[in-house]
Amino acid sequence: GRTMVVGGGFRRKLVLYPIAADETNRPGQRLTNWVVCAKLGDSTTPIPHKDDWSRRADHGEVLELVDGELHTDALDLPALIRATEDVFVYPMCDRDPLAQWSFGRVTLLGDAAHPMYPVGSNGASQAILDGRALADRLAAGGPVEAALQAYDAERRPATAAIVEANRKGGPEGVIDFVEERAPEGFSDLDAVAAPDELRAIVGDYQRLAGFAPEG
């Protein structure tokens, strides 16, 4: 479980990592989570109908997205896809940042307030930060309405910036950055991009999201 693969770019991307071993029933095998992301529309594309938000996919549908686009030396990706009994399709959508969250004694939090593309591990993370900020404001005392407005003013601009950053790939935008410089591939990453350039992309996102290491 120490290895994670994130490959491809913003148009096609593979996320792959082992979860657990089952040495009793399936020796040498691992329960593995894999995701194939494919950009199939843009900001003008209508949001899918509700019935399409979680549907079973045909294996051939996924293999077509992978063919000639994604591969890893770590394993046989087409074989992994074929071996997966149930494959599901989920649309990846977000919403434009809202102008207001708090209305009187009612406010929004988490995905209800800032649905965003699932990159950078920020869906639940930002909801936790929302909850902490809201609890801090309410614990400070004073009118509830004022506490909710203060929470709104603290969290809404921060999460709006993350929504916008995730549209550009979030921290995984480092992959697109390298691909743009070396579209035909490379054998020496340092010859394509300086380590400081790559660290800056990831570090800027960590600071934006609020989980950069302190110190």
Model segments located where?
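FAD-dependent flavoprotein oxygenase/oxidase catalytic domain
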Residues: 1-215
